[in-house]
Amino acid sequence: MNKISQLQLFAVMLCGHAFSLMTFFPYTFDNPTEYMIGVLISTAIEVLLAVPAVIIYKRFSGLDPCSLAGESSKGLRTAAGIFYTLTFFYFAYRVTGNFVYFLDSVLSGYFPRALVVVSVCAAAVYLGLMKASVIGKTSGIMLALFALFTVLVIASSFSKTESDFLSFHLASENITHGISEAVRCELLRNLDMVFLLFFLPKLRGSPVRVSALYLGVKLVMVELSVGFVTVMLGDFAMTSKLPFSSMASYSTSSMIERFDAAFMAVWVILAIVRLGAVLHCSADCIKAVFPKADRTLSVIISAAIPAAAAVHKLTAYDWESTAYDMSGWLLTVTAMLFVPLVIAAFVLLRERREADVRGA
């Protein structure tokens, strides 16, 4: 049975956000405090973004947006399929590119980027072809490993140095701008919420509980992680490309000298899990556009096109223009709020017209 439980979907979404959290904190912020305030505001906005998923679940028996659009017309289904396919392509493009770019920051910059992309995409394609329940179980295991790794690193960091809480300040030239940038940044990183829409038909349970649990735990996870990194690294937390990696290198214990290897292991598998879930959903969207499309081919295409674009950008040494571009937050809002509501409105209008015809 291709079903996924509430906890499994929660794990899929949180694993995705954990990867983006481990990847980097943008250097565009003057201090961590304004970023933490922005995270709080963005979470409140994300509560509103979850409303369309709840409406679709209760009013339309949990259809995904593309299937729901098909209830109105074939043309609307095709349009929805194209939009969400491109959304997941962009999602895969950022995941793949960010992974390889920030791998450059940890390892030598002279390894073949294309080979790394092919390796990661091959593993993600394999996972993307699995059933939703398999993706959910894999995410659950990885979420547990991420939690264990985080606890060990934080505990080891506290045992090595004194905590410096003076780094929590609001000394900034433009606090309002910094907070608004943080809000946009978190909305962009939270493209994982789109999973909520496309796992609806396979979900055993209510999206209300999943979204509430995810947003609550995500808020606590991000705030505590940024807080601990700030306490350990100070202002360096906002200038380091990989503050989690820096803290892992800095942390030590009586049994483990450094946590770099653990960081890399958890980070790589989180990237594969996140990309695998993206490819799984992207194949569903391609099916809405081309009903006779082979699923295996759809998953491979969903990985190949974004990967090729990412490699082209990486080889031109121009990935920073993408990595630190926050305009993608509009895509999260559009994909989660506006498009589902427009589709639902078209379906309701058709139902009303059909009811009027029957009543005439």
Q: Could you tell me what each predicted segment is?
A:
Residues L129-M142, S172, T176, V194-V217, ...:
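Hydrophobic, small-residue-rich membrane helices and short re-entrant helix-turn-helix hairpins
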Residues Y101-S119, A144-G205, D235-P243, M264:
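Helix-loop-helix junctions that connect adjacent transmembrane segments
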Residues M1-T28, G178-V183, L203, F346-A360:
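Membrane-interface "cap" regions at the ends of multi-pass membrane proteins
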Residues I41-A53, T85-V95, A123-V125, A144-F158, ...:
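Selective recognition of specific alpha-helical transmembrane segments in multi-pass small-molecule
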Residues A114-L115, L127-S157, G328-V339:
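Membrane-interface loop-to-helix entry segments
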Residues G16-R113, A122:
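Membrane helical hairpin/interfacial module
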Residues S5, F89-V100, G128, F146-A171, ...:
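Hydrophobic alpha-helical segments and their helix-loop junctions in multi-pass secondary transporters
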Residues M232-D260:
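Membrane-interface interhelical connector segments
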